Amino acid sequence: MARKYFGTDGIRGLVGEGVITPQFFLQLGWAVGKVLAQQNGDKSGGLVLIGKDTRISGYMFESALEAGLISAGVDVGLLGPMPTPAIAYLTRTFQASAGIVISASHNPYTDNGIKLFNTDGTKLPDDVELAIEDQLDRAMTTASKLGKARRIADAEGRYIEFCKGSLPWGFNLRGLNIVVDCANGATYEVAPKVFGELGANVIPIANKPDGLNINLDCGSTKLNQLQKHVLETGADMGIAFDGDGDRVMFVDEKGEVLDGDQLLFIIASHKHKNGGCSGVVGTLMSNFGFELGLKNQGIPFERAKVGDRYVIEAMKNNGWQVGGESSGHIVCSDVTTTGDGIIAALQVLLALKAEKQSLHQLKLRMQKMPQVMINVRVTNKVDLDSHEQVQAAIASAEKRLDGKGRVLLRASGTEPVIRVMVEGQEHQLVASLAQELADIVGEAVA
């Protein structure tokens, strides 16, 4: 059954348009509450935690969700601004019926959306999302017994202790100078405290959210300021999160970027060396050099569809504990249930301290293959699989790569774009082929 509202990572869009309205969030809160009550045998929907990032519209949507849930007889715990993975963790440890995150991740403040977690801190299964969608199309009715709402005062401290507790006893970051870019988002309080309490000298940037500056020229998708600060301060590294804290990117002491593939490689290699990595899940977008680097160590590798829910599903199916995406979504399931930027960063730092090498030296252990990705904005939906001109262009590009690269066209699950990716041994050829393909795709969807 096709979904009407939920995408690959919840619901997301421009505030005030489509379903990103207070009216819809009120109805959504009620629908979630009704489904939870049904799961509990038509008893109370239990407790639902609500957290958010720092965008200004979060307060409006928090109130709407709260009202909808309470009207369905559900108790609500309000967490305030917290990273998405923190909300997953707290949902699990509070034994809540569900957790809701109000966020649009790495998007600008003009967007917002929601993600939902199950009672065990994992993304909601498809059948539950479909049940919620079914309720959304029904008229709201107030429960005979209303729920109550309360603020969770110690949420931040609980999550900080969880992050520190994920490391071996006695581990510290003393002697490291780290620039931390909080994207003016949900990690602005938590991230500097975690690294600082572990002994690092922390230089925080983009840590003054005003509701409008989340992800604005900062964070994991805009690394220029982080690179500049690392070089100017002579720091050992920089760490950047996205607006809701489930993605992470690093910058080494030379100002060079380490993406999700390179960070996963460092984590997996260290775990493998210590007998704790039976395999790694990447995605269709993972760099081929990453795959080769793992195979050279005898580490099995599998590609899943793009989206952390598919990565986690493949990890479970294989019984593996490490997986993630080039974008910086990294899952270490021996520690947490979902992508967690801070936990992933700590795993990289654990490897760095154990290897007694600089981040740049660790970066050089994996040779990335040149990869170019171009986003083509979509105005009309077109079946590219049956589009003769597009398919002919793909075949031509693959022939020119001569079996030493990859071509991938993929519709984004969160934006109205087609991602055109070409990978190969020679950057000039890769860039040329990617642009040629993007131009042809652009004509097809115009």
From Swiss-Prot:
Positions of post-translational Phosphoserine modification: S105
Highest taxon in the source lineage: Bacteria
Broad EC category: isomerase
InterPro entries: A-D-PHexomutase_a/b/a-I (IPR005844), A-D-PHexomutase_a/b/a-I/II/III (IPR016055), A-D-PHexomutase_a/b/a-II (IPR005845), A-D-PHexomutase_a/b/a-III (IPR005846), A-D-PHexomutase_C (IPR005843), A-D-PHexomutase_C_sf (IPR036900), A-D-PHexomutase_CS (IPR016066), Alpha-D-phosphohexomutase_SF (IPR005841)
Catalysed reaction equations from the record: alpha-D-glucosamine 1-phosphate = D-glucosamine 6-phosphate
Active site: S105
Enzyme Commission designation: 5.4.2.10
GO terms (BP aspect): carbohydrate metabolic process; peptidoglycan biosynthetic process; UDP-N-acetylglucosamine biosynthetic process
GO molecular function, one term: phosphomannomutase activity
GO cellular component: cytosol
Binding site for Mg(2+): S105, D242, D244, D246
UniProt xrefs under PROSITE patterns: PGM_PMM
Needed cofactors: Mg(2+)
Cofactor note: Binds 1 Mg(2+) ion per subunit.
Post-translational modification comment from the UniProt entry: Activated by phosphorylation.
Keyword Magnesium (UniProt): yes
Keyword terms, alphabetized: Isomerase, Magnesium, Metal-binding, Phosphoprotein
PANTHER family: PHOSPHOGLUCOMUTASE (ALPHA-D-GLUCOSE-1,6-BISPHOSPHATE-DEPENDENT) (PTHR42946:SF1), PHOSPHOHEXOSE MUTASE (PTHR42946)
Role according to the record: Catalyzes the conversion of glucosamine-6-phosphate to glucosamine-1-phosphate.
Similarity-based family: Belongs to the phosphohexose mutase family.
Family annotation (HAMAP family): GlmM_B (MF_01554_B)
Name of the protein: Phosphoglucosamine mutase
Classification of source organism: Bacteria, Pseudomonadati, Pseudomonadota, Gammaproteobacteria, Cellvibrionales
